[in-house]
């Protein structure tokens, strides 16, 4: 990190967050263009990403984002469900335009389409799943930033942020760090203070699993007799009698 001024070097907490979120864990394979971002290979075959390179690219990407005068001209996209919440929160804090879910083909190239837009910068969570917007951005000369794993192909990617883009915690942390750095550069928050927003706000949550977890916890906490009473108690049925003649 000697190429950075002391103020721009990552704090120990930032490195610990990356390790806790497994940002450094790559895949079993490595693309030839991603070899320079790897540190070593573990005995189990997984490549380890060099977090110093990750931090450098976060710094570079944040400065590119700040250079865009109108933040609404920045499009942030994630077709991957694990990155959709992070994309929405990131766009909300920096003022960008978020596209979560399926990307409509022709959004950047088909002018007769109702959703046609001309962004000045594109940010994607996965170059593989977000291949369509990356391809369209290359047609119309839109610079791109992407979260890239060791197996990611960098075709159409101008700035690759090496990280684990397969885990929800790692994706959330990358967008959180990028948003915080943008706010630092804009002067929205002082660099010597801690950002009040927690990483947890960016982490994907499965809304379908929450009711099931609550139900399971309630059943486990309730006494067995109470559960049996709830499940098997039946209202008494009045006896039928023939009407008097």
Swiss-Prot record:
Its main location: cytoplasm. InterPro entries: Ribosomal_uS2 (IPR001865), Ribosomal_uS2_CS (IPR018130), Ribosomal_uS2_euk (IPR027498), Ribosomal_uS2_euk/arc (IPR005707), Ribosomal_uS2_flav_dom_sf (IPR023591). It is found in: Cytoplasm. SUPFAM superfamilies: Ribosomal protein S2. Pfam families: Ribosomal_S2. GO terms for molecular function: structural constituent of ribosome. GO terms for biological process: cytoplasmic translation; response to bacterium; ribosomal small subunit assembly. Gene3D superfamilies: Glucose-6-phosphate isomerase like protein, domain 1. One of its GO terms (cellular component) is extracellular matrix. Keywords: Cytoplasm, Ribonucleoprotein, Ribosomal protein. It comes from the Eukaryota. PANTHER family: 40S RIBOSOMAL PROTEIN SA (PTHR11489). Belongs to the universal ribosomal protein uS2 family. NCBIfam families: uS2_euk_arch. Required for the assembly and/or stability of the 40S ribosomal subunit. Required for the processing of the 20S rRNA-precursor to mature 18S rRNA in a late step of the maturation of 40S ribosomal subunits. Component of the small ribosomal subunit. Mature ribosomes consist of a small (40S) and a large (60S) subunit. The 40S subunit contains about 33 different proteins and 1 molecule of RNA (18S). The 60S subunit contains about 49 different proteins and 3 molecules of RNA (25S, 5.8S and 5S). Interacts with ribosomal protein S21. This is Small ribosomal subunit protein uS2. It comes from Dictyostelium discoideum.
